[in-house]
């Protein structure tokens, strides 16, 4: 009645539709049945720290689990707010350049220093005050000072000497391609757009703020050459007291300690209750259990809308395909609307590979693109790929032969996404 009231909701419609008709239905079937209620849903800004905070948190491990190489080290910095579309995208690009891309400089420096067994980055931008995190996983508590020193020294060097321009432009192109393509995999596009709208809408901003990216990318491409990203590092990651260093350490016996605290708390609460209050809890628990175990009445189940056979389209989708041959190679082309993006797959049969060597085909797939070549380091190769494409991926698959039981055809596939103009 309070939290699930439509006055406390955000409603959006997505798709090609008669908007007036849908809004009329929404009002007639839902909104008109409620009176408007004032709702104070404003999320207030947290006051910045006067100086960085340092905290250690413990997590439980069993008696058999080792304490060595089981600590998580992180430095987390608040970055402006979520209502700046340029900052919102710029730090996604910085996360990619510093920590996510193959050969990313900050990750590389931390790994070279032997800190932790893996380095992670995170830019949490779905909240009013986003934060940027650098995390060393499976580290030791004794590495904390070296971790912080390496992070700050690397960031200072980048701020003073500049970030590799090719890496920056590759990161910008990577996110611009993702924005234009809007490929959310199996997730409905309308749902993902709606969630992205909430990144600003929940905090009083324009719902379309983070969907309108043309001006943002145009600015970032120009600003990348003018020291903009270096200034972001200096302002938000080096000279910013709104920072928390969090150490998460393992502790044996912690589960038993927490269980005992909970037992004592519940025991104290029980002693504060009268006999009638205790009985009310018992009765309420019994009623809840009965409700959960009782099947829903048939008439209620029939209220749930279901697809009818007549709702399913009878016509099969047309398979648009042309087949031709280029230099002795069969080429299959699909002429479809793809928002100006070309999708290319080059497929190689693996019939000629001896069966004993087939596992190495999988190994080849795993390392290609992540090792140095005769012309590029693996970091430079990643930049070249992201500057010129929307990504290149490799896969290995097998297809059963319907004409011969137990036979199959192995395929090694290289897939690329590129703007048609390229």
What residue ranges belong to the model's regions?
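Extended, regular secondary-structure scaffolds
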Residues: 19-37, 161, 239-242, 251-288
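M16 family metallopeptidases and their MPP-like homologs
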Residues: 1, 8-14, 70-80, 107-222, ...
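His/Glu-based metal-binding/catalytic segments typifying zinc-dependent metallopeptidases
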Residues: 39-103, 133, 188-211, 270-365, ...
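Non-catalytic, conformational "gating/processing" segments within enzyme and secreted inhibitor domains
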Residues: 1-29
């Amino acid at each position: 009645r309070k939290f699930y009231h439509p006055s406390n909701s955000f409603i959006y419609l997505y798709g090609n539709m008669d908007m007036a008709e849908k809004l009329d239905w929404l009002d007639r079937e839902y909104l008109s049945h409620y009176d408007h209620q004032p709702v104070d849903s404003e999320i207030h800004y947290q006051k910045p720290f006067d100086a960085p905070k340092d905290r250690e948190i413990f997590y439980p491990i069993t008696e058999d689990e080792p304490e060595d190489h089981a600590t998580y080290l992180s430095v987390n910095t608040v970055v402006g707010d979520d209502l700046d579309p340029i900052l919102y995208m710029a730090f996604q690009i910085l996360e990619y350049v510093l920590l996510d891309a193959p050969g990313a400089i900050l990750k590389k420096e931390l790994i070279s220093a032997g800190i932790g067994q893996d380095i992670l980055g995170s830019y949490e931008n779905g909240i009013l005050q986003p934060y940027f995190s650098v995390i060393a996983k499976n580290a030791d508590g004794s590495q904390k000072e070296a971790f912080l020193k390496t992070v700050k020294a690397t960031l200072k060097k980048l701020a003073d000497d500049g970030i590799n321009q090719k890496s920056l432009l590759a990161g910008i192109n990577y996110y611009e391609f993702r924005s234009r393509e809007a490929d959310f995999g199996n997730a409905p596009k309308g749902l993902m757009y709606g969630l992205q709208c909430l990144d600003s809408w929940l905090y009083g901003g324009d719902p379309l703020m983070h969907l309108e990216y043309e001006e943002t990318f145009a600015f970032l491409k120009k600003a990348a050459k003018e020291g903009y990203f270096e200034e972001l590092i200096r302002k938000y990651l080096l000279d910013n007291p709104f920072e928390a260093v969090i150490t998460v350490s393992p502790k044996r016996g912690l589960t038993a300690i927490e269980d005992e605290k909970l037992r004592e708390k519940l025991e104290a609460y029980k002693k504060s209750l009268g006999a009638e209050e205790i009985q009310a809890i018992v009765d309420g628990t019994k009623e809840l259990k009965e409700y959960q175990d009782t099947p829903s009445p048939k008439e209620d189940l029939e209220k749930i809308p279901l697809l009818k056979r007549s709702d399913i389209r009878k016509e099969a989708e047309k398979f648009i395909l042309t087949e031709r041959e280029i230099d002795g190679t069969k080429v299959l082309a699909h002429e479809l609307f793809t928002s100006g993006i070309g999708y290319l797959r080059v497929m190689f049969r693996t019939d000629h590979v001896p069966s004993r060597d087939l596992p190495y085909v999988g190994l080849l797939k795993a390392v290609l693109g992540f090792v140095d070549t005769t012309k590029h380091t693996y970091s430079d190769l990643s930049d070249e790929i992201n500057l010129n494409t929307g990504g290149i991926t490799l896969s290995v698959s097998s297809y059963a032969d319907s004409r011969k039981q137990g036979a199959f055809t192995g395929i090694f596939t290289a897939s690329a996404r590129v703007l048609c103009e390229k």
